[in-house]
UniProtKB/Swiss-Prot annotation:
First-tier enzyme category under EC: ligase
Similarity comment: family membership: Belongs to the class-II aminoacyl-tRNA synthetase family.
Ligand binding (Mg(2+) 2): 418
Reaction(s) catalysed (UniProt annotation): tRNA(Lys) + L-lysine + ATP = L-lysyl-tRNA(Lys) + AMP + diphosphate
NCBIfam families noted in UniProt: lysS_bact, PRK00484.1
UniProt organism field: Enterococcus faecalis (strain ATCC 700802 / V583)
The protein's name in its UniProt record: Lysine--tRNA ligase
UniProt EC number: 6.1.1.6
Amino acid sequence: MAEEQQAHLEDLNDQMLVRREKMEALREEGIDPFGKRFDRTHNSAELHEQYDNHTKEELSEMNTEVSVAGRMMTKRGKGKAGFAHLQDREGQIQIYVRKDQVGDEAYELFKHADLGDFFGVTGQVMKTNTGEVTVKAQTITLLTKALRPLPDKYHGLTNVEQRYRQRYLDLISNKESFDRFMKRSQIISEIRRYLDGNGYVEVETPVLHNEAGGAAARPFITHHNALDMDLYLRIALELHLKRLIVGGMEKVYEIGRVFRNEGIDTTHNPEFTMLEAYTAYTDYQDVMDLTEGIIRNAAEKVLGTTDITYDGQAVDLGSPFKRLHMVDAVKEQTGVDFWQEMTIEEARALAKEHNVEITDAMTVGHIINEFFETFVEDTLQQPTFIYGHPVAVSPLAKKNPEDGRFTDRFELFIIGKEFANAFTELNDPIDQRERFEEQEKEREQGNDEAHGVDEDFIEALEYGLPPTGGLGIGIDRLVMLLTDAQSIRDVLLFPTMR
């Protein structure tokens, strides 16, 4: 153990060694370098809100005592007085420390403090000659000694990967990043508030599943030792939530982590946060209204506006979202009319003619979807509901009563990316079994995103699922949109890293 400790010390740079020497010196003086609780009367925002509008003379007359605490981010001064800025969650507050006010011992503590140390200060609110609200210290208390120096205050963390791996440093040194994560929390709170206010019940469903289902995705597999059985981390929330509609809960939602064993890029992380909501006695058109309401409300409440900018592109979340059938969208962009009945050979010929990559296992429905993804998706900059997906790519959606080739399903696209997926739920257990069996055949042919028959779910449907509208929204992508973040890693506190 002593050898390991010695090796660790040898790895430290000069600044770190000096800080450790200061820590030991504090201990020798009977001062705990890692402090204890401290009672604050104000955070920085409250202090500025209450006192910014007062003059220097008014504050001197008021002689108000406050207690503040935070991480020391700047320090200047020499001789018998100095200034510093303490940073808390809301921002920064300046402190003014004089030797003749705090005493020799406390002033020495301040004088030898390093940036990054935590302090608690009690004193009077004043204003400097430059008009900055400041706490003139009567007492100053070391709360935590930082043993490592912070990133350079002018350059911050320039290494993007380090920002993701050491998010705590990113939060300390990058206000934009800190504010984004505060907004993320507010966005999720507003989504909850909106759904709760509309009569939805928040529930929690299992993360470990016997059968992966509810989405076309490759799952993570784990093993339960006591039961000696493989289990899957959930790839969607859907199938358990629909069981609750069968059980009579009528309006339910869950915001939770979902796991997919797939690639990582600017919009995909192996674990991410989903909102799924299910409403009895509704259909996919009602769910369009719900989706619009959730997103518009989050923008209004958190940003104060529905006119936002993403990557330089203006996006209008306040106007009614456009609604367009997938086949019409493909026809607009390519001239190809998939409303016409056609054989698989004819569809393959069209794909070849338009350089659309397909596989032998694809049906006409799959090919329509490939046309959409190739030619249409990137063009959808303003909020657009694309509805009428083919049955082949929608195993859990109800068939359209007028045209059984398509489903009552929609996806919401903004800035060329998918933000929501929803449909009138398939509530016919016979049809559901057939679709599961089709999926099982696809899996046997090598499609590792297709899944088998979920007997327990079918049994639940046989007890009766009322007509139901279901919705899934990727929370991380929505936060990206509302905070103008270019990568999903910028909205995940601790993204998956190699």
